[in-house]
From Swiss-Prot:
Cysteines paired by S-S bonds: none
Organism field: Acetivibrio thermocellus (Hungateiclostridium thermocellum)
Notes on temperature effects: Optimum temperature is 75 degrees Celsius.
Matching InterPro entries: AB_hydrolase_fold, CenC_carb-bd, Dockerin_1_rpt, Dockerin_dom, Dockerin_dom_sf, EF_Hand_1_Ca_BS, Esterase-like, Galactose-bd-like_sf
Any one GO BP annotation for this protein: xylan catabolic process
CBM-cenC domain boundaries: 33-180, 565-714
Identification of the protein by name: Endo-1,4-beta-xylanase Y
pH dependence: Optimum pH is 6.8.
GO MF annotation terms: endo-1,4-beta-xylanase activity
Record keywords, A-Z: Carbohydrate metabolism, Glycosidase, Hydrolase, Polysaccharide degradation, Repeat, Signal, Xylan degradation
Amino acid sequence: MKNKRVLAKITALVVLLGVFFVLPSNISQLYADYEVVHDTFEVNFDGWCNLGVDTYLTAVENEGNNGTRGMMVINRSSASDGAYSEKGFYLDGGVEYKYSVFVKHNGTGTETFKLSVSYLDSETEEENKEVIATKDVVAGEWTEISAKYKAPKTAVNITLSITTDSTVDFIFDDVTITRKGMAEANTVYAANAVLKDMYANYFRVGSVLNSGTVNNSSIKALILREFNSITCENEMKPDATLVQSGSTNTNIRVSLNRAASILNFCAQNNIAVRGHTLVWHSQTPQWFFKDNFQDNGNWVSQSVMDQRLESYIKNMFAEIQRQYPSLNLYAYDVVNEAVSDDANRTRYYGGAREPGYGNGRSPWVQIYGDNKFIEKAFTYARKYAPANCKLYYNDYNEYWDHKRDCIASICANLYNKGLLDGVGMQSHINADMNGFSGIQNYKAALQKYINIGCDVQITELDISTENGKFSLQQQADKYKAVFQAAVDINRTSSKGKVTAVCVWGPNDANTWLGSQNAPLLFNANNQPKPAYNAVASIIPQSEWGDGNNPAGGGGGGKPEEPDANGYYYHDTFEGSVGQWTARGPAEVLLSGRTAYKGSESLLVRNRTAAWNGAQRALNPRTFVPGNTYCFSVVASFIEGASSTTFCMKLQYVDGSGTQRYDTIDMKTVGPNQWVHLYNPQYRIPSDATDMYVYVETADDTINFYIDEAIGAVAGTVIEGPAPQPTQPPVLLGDVNGDGTINSTDLTMLKRSVLRAITLTDDAKARADVDKNGSINSTDVLLLSRYLLRVIDKFPVAENPSSSFKYESAVQYRPAPDSYLNPCPQAGRIVKETYTGINGTKSLNVYLPYGYDPNKKYNIFYLMHGGGENENTIFSNDVKLQNILDHAIMNGELEPLIVVTPTFNGGNCTAQNFYQEFRQNVIPFVESKYSTYAESTTPQGIAASRMHRGFGGFSMGGLTTWYVMVNCLDYVAYFMPLSGDYWYGNSPQDKANSIAEAINRSGLSKREYFVFAATGSDHIAYANMNPQIEAMKALPHFDYTSDFSKGNFYFLVAPGATHWWGYVRHYIYDALPYFFHE
C-alpha cells in the first residue's frame, strides 16, 4: 500500500507541540519542502467526488498507476462531468503549488484532459474557476498532467477537478500537491491538557465540522488536538445526501459529496464519526414523500414509503462503506426530533408531530398517521448498519418532563426489541443552573434515559450566555455540571453509560446560535474559555487515558453486566411493574392481594385466551442468541380453577422471519400456592431476534400473579417456594383414611354398598380395592378375605385387551395429499434446551392438539439422519407435524407426544446416543411433559416402558438399533427406518447381539415390538434385509404386523429411495401400530 503523506502529519507535529506550550509569536514558520497532498486511493476515496449528477466514481483494484488501486470515472453525461475534491484545508491563496495527477483512458485515439482549480474569492464572494493544465493522452497509457499555479491571496475553499473534452470513462491516481519554501505553522493555544485524553476512560469528546470549518486549518488543528468524535453539522442530513434524479421507490440514490472532505479528514486522522441524521421532518426534501419524486405530487402510500425508507437507509450505509471503509462510523442518529413539544400531543398522540410539511410539521406523520415510522427506521438501520455502529434516537428539549417521558417510552420499546442502542440528548441549553433547562431537570432526564438500560450520548451541547445575560463563569459552572453528571453516571450506573459528550461547534465564531451568545468552549480566536478550564478540572491526571483509543472505543453498546448475585434483571414488583407488559388484551398491574416476597406482586387479569399473559423484552446485547442463561419466576392463582399449568416461554423471531414460541419451564399447581418456574440452563436459539420472556397458562383464562422474576447467568441457583407436599399413595382398603386397614373400614364399605352412607371421592378411591372403577360386593369380599388373611394383597383388574384393528401384512400406504397441508386442529412444536453429558443441546417436542397436562400420553422419540439435526423432522420440507395433526384429528392415531432429539454435539454419535438418551433426554422431557412415567427415576421410567417408543431414519435407524440393545428396560417399541445395526461381521452377528440383549432383559415376546421400514430402492435395503431375515429366524420374534399376535414386521415400500418424502409415510403407516399392548 502506498504511503499517505498529507499535511496532517505536519499539523500533528504542531498540535503535539501545542499540547505542552503556547508557541511563541516569533516562531511562525517551519522550513521544509513537502507534499501538501498525496491521494493514493489505496483505502478510501480521499475526499474525491463525482462531478455531474449521474457520474459515478468507483475504486478499481490493480488498475491504478503502477498496478495499484485507482479511481475510475464512468457514466459521464457531458464533457464537464468528471471528478473533484475540496482541498481548502491544505491550500492557501497567494501561495504557489505544483499540482500533479496521473490519468489514463481506454477509449480510442487521443483524449484531451483538463486539470482545473476553482475557489471562492473571500472579498467579492464570487466563484472562480481556471484550467491550469491540459494534456492530450493516448489511449491505454498512464500520463502525468501537472502545472504550477497560484490562486489569489483572497482565495478560499480551493477545489481541484479533472475532466476531458468528451464523455469517455477514465482512471486517475496519485494526486499530489506540493509547495516550496516555508510551511506556515498552525498556532493553537491550549490549556495544559486535552479533552479527549482527560475523558478517554469515560467517553468520547466530540465537536462539529461543516463545509466551511473543514477548510479552516486552525479549527482542524484544534479538532485534531482536543476531540475524538466528529459530527457533520449539515452535510449528512437528508437534503445533503438524497439525490432526486434517477431515484426509484426501491433504489433511492444518495451522495456523500457534501460530506466527503469531512469524512476524508476523519478517516485520515482516525477520528470517529457520528452520523447525523437519517429520518427527520426538517431538512428532508418534499419530493422524497411524493409521487414521481415531485414536490407537487400526491403523498405516497405507507407501503411505498417503507420501500423508500429502507432503500435510503440501506444505500447510505453502503455508500459510506464503499467510499470510506476505514472510517470509524461509531454512532448514527437514526431518527431526529420526532417527538412534539406540545404536551397535548405527547399525552394523546404518542408524541407525533402535526402532519404536513414545513413549520415543524412532519411529512412522516402525514404518511404513516403516527410515529410508527420510528420503529421501521430503526429496524432497517439495524439490518444495514455496520456491527460497530450504535443506533440513536436524538432530540431537543429532551429534559422537558412530558417530552422526556414520551421519548423514554418510545426508546425503551425500541431498546427492548434490540433495535436501539441509545438516546441522543441534544442539550441546547443556557447558563442558568435553574429554570427550564436547569441542571436538576437535565440530570433527571439523563437518569431517566439511563434507566432504560441503553446508553446516552450528549450530542449537540452548547450553553448560551444569551448575549451577556449570563457570565462566562456561570457558563463554566453549567458546563462543569453537565460533564460531571455524565462522569457520575459512568462511575455508578450498572445499566447504560454515557459514551460521548459532543459540543455543537468548534468555537464561538462558528455556532448556529451566533457569536454574541458565546456558547462554546473556545472563543472566536480558538482560545480556551473558563468553561474549558472548568471541564478540564474534573478528571484527575491519574485517570487520564489515550484519547485516540478511548475505553471501549467510546461507542457504547456493551452488554449489561450481572450483579453480585449473577442477575441481569431482578423484578420484585415492589412499587413498579418494571419492564413487564401485557400480552393481547390482558392487563398487568401491581397487586397487594398476594405476594411471594415483599408486599406486592404483578397481577395479570382480563385475559380472553390462554396466551394472554405478561412479557418482558430481552436485550440481545445481554441475552445473546446461542448462549445459555438462567430464567426464574414464581407464579400463583387464587380462584377460578382447581389447578392450572403455568408456562414460562420465549417468544422470538427465527432466521426465516417466523415467530416462534419455546418453553423454558412449565409446572402445574393448585390455588393459593406459589410454583417455581425455573430453568438454570436455558439456551436461547442462535437465530433468535425480537425476544420476549413471558408467562401464561396452558389452557385457561384465570387471573394470576407472578413475583420475583429473574434473568441470570447460566447455572445460577435460585431458591423458589418449597414443593407442595404430595398426596400420600392411596392405601387400598383404608376406607376411613386413618392409615390402617381394619373392621371399621369393612363396615364403612358395606354401608356404602348398601347406600346407607355416601363416601367422599378419596374414600371411594380407597374402597375400590380391585381398581375396576366401581364399588360393589366384590370389593366387600376382597376386603373381608384380606382381613381374614386369606389374601395378602388385593388383585387388580387386568386392563382390557386392545381393540385396535391390526393388519397382519401392512403395505406401504402414503398419507393422503391433504395431510401435507396445515391442519385446522394443529398441535404445536416446542423447542427445549437441556444440559447433559454431551453439553447443552436442543430438541423439539410435538404436543398434540388439545394437549392436557392432566392427562397421560404415550411418547415417541424420533431421530434424524446423518448431516441433519433436531429441526429437520418438523421442518417445512418434511411436514411430519401436518401428517400427525391430520391422523390424530381423523382418529387414525391416538394423541401422543413426539420428540426429535439429536446425536450431534459433544462426544455424541449415532451409536452412543443411547447413553445421553437414558441419562438426560428421557428424564428432562418426561419431567416437563405428561407421560405415563410416574417419576423420572430409573424405576419410574422402566415402569412406563410400554408407553415409550424410539425410531429413526438412516443414521437415526442405526441409533434405534443401539437404543434397543441398550435400553430395552426403558423402551418397548422400536421403529428403525432405512438403517441397519452396525455390529459384527454378518447379519447373524447383528441378530445374535439383539437376541442377547433381549435375553439379558428377561422380557417376554409380548413386551418388545419392532416395526422396521425402508424402500426397495434405498441403499440401506441391501444391509437391512439380511439382518431382518436373520432376526426372523430367532425364537425371540414372531413376524407379523399384528402385534396382538406377534412383535416384529418389516415394511418395504416399492421403488422408494433415500428421501424424507417417503420416510414420513413410513411413520404414518407404522406409528398407529404402537402402544396398544
